Regions:
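Short, hydrophobic/amphipathic alpha-helical patches that form generic packing surfaces
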Residues: 1-4, 19, 53, 57, ...
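Aromatic-lined carbohydrate-binding surfaces of glycoside hydrolases
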Residues: 1-147, 154-163, 236-241
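Intrinsically disordered, low-complexity boundary segments flanking structured domains
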Residues: 53-54, 114-115, 179-184, 256-259
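Residue-level recognition of short, well-ordered coil/turn positions
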Residues: 63, 191, 290-294
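Catalytic domains of carbohydrate-active enzymes that cleave complex glycans
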Residues: 79-81, 89, 93-157, 227, ...
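Eukaryote-skewed repeat-based solenoidal scaffolds used as protein-protein interaction platforms
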Residues: 117, 135-154, 159-170, 174-193, ...
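Catalytic-core region of carbohydrate-active enzymes that cleave or remodel glycosidic bonds
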Residues: 167-251
Length: 330
C-alpha cells in the first residue's frame, strides 16, 4: 500500500482527529487517531499514540511533506469522546457558532499544538475540512488561526478563503474562479492550490467505466492551468464486495476506490500515476526551456489542449497521446 502510494507521488498523510468525519460517504467507518477523554473532574485528556505511529509510518515511505487532520467540521457535526464519569462514549452535537464548539476545539487544538511542536510536525500540519460551507469554514478558521494552525479545504471556491487556506483544493472547473492575481499571491506565500474530482463529475474522472486516458488527463489539466496538482477524494474506500462490484450507494461505480484489496492495482490507477509523472516532467521542462523559446512554445501549445475540462473520454485520449509523444522524446 505505501509503496504504491509513494509511486503515485503522494506527499501528504490524512489523519483523523474525531470519530467518523465523513458520515455515509464510506462503507467502513473511521476511528479517531487521537483518543479524546473527558476526565471525571471535567478536564480533557488526549492520547496521540495511534496518530504518532501513523505519521511515523507514512514518513518511512516518504509521505511526509504535509499532514492534513480531519475534521473540525465533520459531515454530521457530531464529536465522540470517552467520558470517565459515565464510563462510556458520549457525543457533542453542535454547530460552529456555539460556545460549546469553541471550547471543545480550543482545548483540543492547544494540546494538539503542544504535541505537534514537541514532535517537530507543527509547521507541516493543516486542520482539514471536506466540502464544508463557507460560514462554517470561517468560524473554524477563527479558532484554528488564533492558535497558529494552518487550514486546508477540499470543496467549492470561496473568495473569502483564498488568502486564508494553506491548502485549497477546489472542485474541477471551480479553479477557473481564481484570478491570476489570487493564484500568484497564494504561490508567493507557499500556499497550495489544487483540483479534485468526485461523484459530481461525469467526465473526465476515474470511474470503473471511465476511459483510462481520463485519469492521465487530470494531472495534465492541473499543469496547464498553473495548479499544484490533482486529488481524487478516495482511492481505497472499499465497498462490501470490492473485487466484484465497485458501486457504492449514490456514488458512480469505482468513485470510492481505484486500488483493490490484496495489493491489486488497476488500469485507471496506473494511468493516474502516468499523468502525475507527466505533470512532474512538465514542471522540469518549463524550467529547462526558459532559454529555449522554440521548445517552450511547443510545450505551451500542447498544454493549451488541456486548459478546458469540458472534454469527453475520447478527447482525453487524443490530447494525452499527443503530449506523450513530445514528453517521451525529451
Amino acid at each position: 500500500w505505501f509503496v504504491e502510494h509513494d509511486s503515485a507521488d503522494s506527499t501528504l498523510s490524512g489523519a483523523i482527529m474525531f470519530y467518523e468525519p465523513w458520515g455515509e460517504q464510506t462503507h467502513d467507518l473511521f476511528d479517531p487517531m487521537v483518543q479524546t477523554t473527558k476526565k471525571a473532574n471535567g478536564t480533557w485528556a488526549y492520547d496521540y499514540t495511534i496518530f504518532d505511529k501513523y505519521v511515523e509510518l507514512c514518513a518511512e515511505y516518504g509521505i511526509d511533506k504535509q499532514i492534513n487532520c480531519f475534521s473540525m467540521v465533520p459531515w454530521d457535526m457530531n464529536f465522540r469522546y470517552w467520558d470517565e464519569a459515565s464510563v462510556s462514549f458520549q457525543y457533542i452535537q453542535t454547530t460552529t457558532k456555539t460556545d460549546e464548539y469553541r471550547e471543545l476545539w480550543t482545548n483540543f487544538l492547544k494540546a494538539f499544538k503542544a504535541h505537534l511542536i514537541e514532535k517537530g510536525w507543527f509547521e507541516k500540519t493543516n486542520i482539514a475540512m471536506d466540502e464544508r460551507a463557507e460560514s462554517d469554514m470561517l468560524n473554524a478558521y477563527q479558532i484554528a488561526n488564533a492558535l497558529g494552525f494552518k487550514m486546508a479545504l477540499a470543496g467549492n471556491y470561496h473568495a473569502s478563503l483564498c488568502d486564508k487556506l494553506q491548502d485549497f483544493c477546489v472542485a474541477l472547473g471551480q479553479d477557473k474562479k481564481f484570478t491570476s492575481e489570487q493564484l500568484a499571491a497564494r504561490r508567493a506565500k507557499g500556499q497550495v492550490t489544487t483540483i479534485y474530482t468526485s461523484c459530481a463529475d461525469v467526465e473526465p474522472n476515474i470511474y470503473s467505466n471511465s476511459l483510462p486516458a481520463e485519469a492521465t488527463f487530470l494531472p495534465l489539466y492541473a499543469a496547464a492551468n498553473g495548479l499544484d496538482g490533482y486529488l481524487h477524494w478516495a482511492w481505497i474506500n472499499w465497498d462490501e464486495h470490492p473485487l466484484t462490484d465497485s458501486r457504492f450507494r449514490k456514488f458512480g461505480a469505482g468513485d470510492t476506490y481505484c486500488y483493490y484489496p490484496g495489493n491489486r492495482s488497476s488500469v485507471r490507477f496506473e494511468r493516474l500515476i502516468e499523468g502525475i509523472h507527466q505533470y512532474e516532467k512538465v514542471q522540469i521542462l518549463k524550467e529547462e526551456y526558459k532559454d529555449n523559446p522554440e521548445k517552450k512554445a511547443k510545450l505551451e501549445t500542447l498544454l493549451d489542449a488541456f486548459k478546458s475540462h469540458a472534454v469527453v473520454g475520447e478527447d482525453c485520449a487524443e490530447k494525452v497521446n499527443a503530449i506523450e509523444v513530445f514528453l517521451n522524446e525529451e
